Amino acid sequence: MGSPMASLVATLLVLTISLTFVSQSTANYFYSSPPPPVKHYTPPVKHYSPPPVYHSPPPPKKHYEYKSPPPPVKHYSPPPVYHSPPPPKKHYVYKSPPPPVKHYSPPPVYHSPPPPKKHYVYKSPPPPVKHYSPPPVYHSPPPPKKHYVYKSPPPPVKHYSPPPVYHSPPPPKKHYVYKSPPPPVKHYSPPPVYHSPPPPKKHYVYKSPPPPVKHYSPPPVYHSPPPPKKHYVYKSPPPPVKHYSPPPVYHSPPPPKKHYVYKSPPPPVKHYSPPPVYHSPPPPKKHYVYKSPPPPVKHYSPPPVYHSPPPPKKHYVYKSPPPPVKHYSPPPVYHSPPPPKKHYVYKSPPPPVKHYSPPPVYHSPPPPKKHYVYKSPPPPVKHYSPPPVYHSPPPPKEKYVYKSPPPPPVHHYSPPHHPYLYKSPPPPYHY
């Protein structure tokens, strides 16, 4: 009997344990009940993966703006179009994207479950873990949502993919230096004849080598820079080397400075006449300004009449211009469109027109030019989209880029070079 009783007790214990486990499992299921929704929410995540599509709506907004401007554009020529867009920028009409945020309303729900997880997930993680084996993948996307920007940056990266190609050019510079030295070696075959100067070497072995530099017309540039390295001149020369392909001759004179060889350099000075031509490249930088002004000038040749509309923005100036309008029998056609925009101006201007004569028109346009000439340049800036290509190489120069900017200074240093030559002669005189 003892054995049957023991077996019964054992079975009862097993049943109780199983029931407790069942209750616990049910309890766990109660906690895991939220996860199921998570599974349902996972699909939304997949749908959210293409949020970029939501970014596309903004363009339509642009169309929205274009819908209103078109009418004026016809009557107001192109200028009105440019003026109308600016205001929207100030108002940040693009802030309307919030509507898409409404579409993101579900994500908040997705975020709400996590908190509970923090409170109870730790207690019953083991069971959920099994069901959440795939969720981990879904948890990774949420972080991007927090950064939100993380999703948008990738596209720019794609556009920046080409710049890396420009990073490769810098290396060529290093090769450029290697290419130039070899030739010098060949030219150094005759230098033996110049070994006669060795006596000077006793005074300045480093200074005497320069004489051979004459035959070493191009190399001198590379040898002379090394000393400057102490003064950091080396950092700035590298960049110039490209544009200063001829300047090497310019550097050759310095060596002569040390001795009476300076008298012979004068002839090279004549050869330096061309270097100024190389200084002309810098002007391209001036193009920076040159590019922006020209466009305005071309487009503004006829605008004089169009400039009169700008005053309307001042409200008060607009009332005074109308007078000239009468004198400008033909222009009235152009002025009539702008007034409609303001409505109010169109009603009161006529009277003043008679008293304001035409001069006011001329005075009103000038100011607009100042205000709009600067606004119009921005388009040219678009043409400057390529310049970024030049900026991409600089990064590689980072090691020396910070001092490579001196390229422009180099142009300024061109004159200093002459002083440098004059400074070197004095020593000989002292000797």
Swiss-Prot record:
Expressed in which tissues: Predominantly expressed in the roots.
Q: Where is the signal peptide?
A: 1-27
A single GO cellular-component term on record: extracellular region
Q: What is the lineage of its organism?
A: Eukaryota, Viridiplantae, Streptophyta, Embryophyta, Tracheophyta
Gene for this chain: EXT3
Give the family from UniProt. Answer: Belongs to the extensin family.
Repeat (sequence) residue spans along the chain: 33-41, 49-55, 56-63, 68-76, 77-83, 84-91, 96-104, 105-111, 112-119, 124-132, 133-139, 140-147, 152-160, 161-167, 168-175, 180-188, 189-195, 196-203, 208-216, 217-223, 224-231, 236-244, 245-251, 252-259, 264-272, 273-279, 280-287, 292-300, 301-307, 308-315, 320-328, 329-335, 336-343, 348-356, 357-363, 364-371, 376-384, 385-391
Designated name of the protein: Extensin-3
Q: Where in the cell is it found?
A: Secreted, Primary cell wall
GO biological process entries: plant-type cell wall organization
TM regions (residue ranges): none
Q: What job does this protein perform?
A: Structural component which strengthens the primary cell wall. Forms dendritic structures indicating a propensity for self-assembly through tyrosine cross-linking. Forms intermolecular cross-links exclusively by pulcherosine (three Tyr). Scaffold formation requires an unobstructed C-terminus of EXT3. Required for the correct positioning of the cell plate during cytokinesis in cells of the developing embryo. Extensins contain a characteristic repeat of the pentapeptide Ser-Pro(4). For this particular extensin, a typical repeat of Ser-Pro(3) is found.
**Keywords for this entry?**
Cell wall, Cell wall biogenesis/degradation, Glycoprotein, Hydroxylation, Repeat, Secreted, Signal
Q: What's a single GO MF annotation on this record?
A: structural constituent of cell wall
Pro residues bias (residue ranges): 49-59, 68-87, 96-115, 124-143, 152-171, 180-199, 208-227, 236-255, 264-283, 292-311, 320-339, 348-367, 376-395
Q: Where is this region: 12 X 8 AA repeats of S-P-P-P-P-K-K-H?
A: 56-371
The species this protein was found in: Arabidopsis thaliana (Mouse-ear cress)
According to the record, the residues making up region (Disordered) are 42-408
- Broad class of where this protein is predominantly found: secreted
Induction details: By wounding, water and cold stresses; in response to plant hormones 2,4-D, BAP, GA3, and ABA treatment; in response to L-Ser, Hyp and L-Pro treatment. Slightly repressed by salt stress.
Q: Which InterPro entries match?
A: Extensin_dom
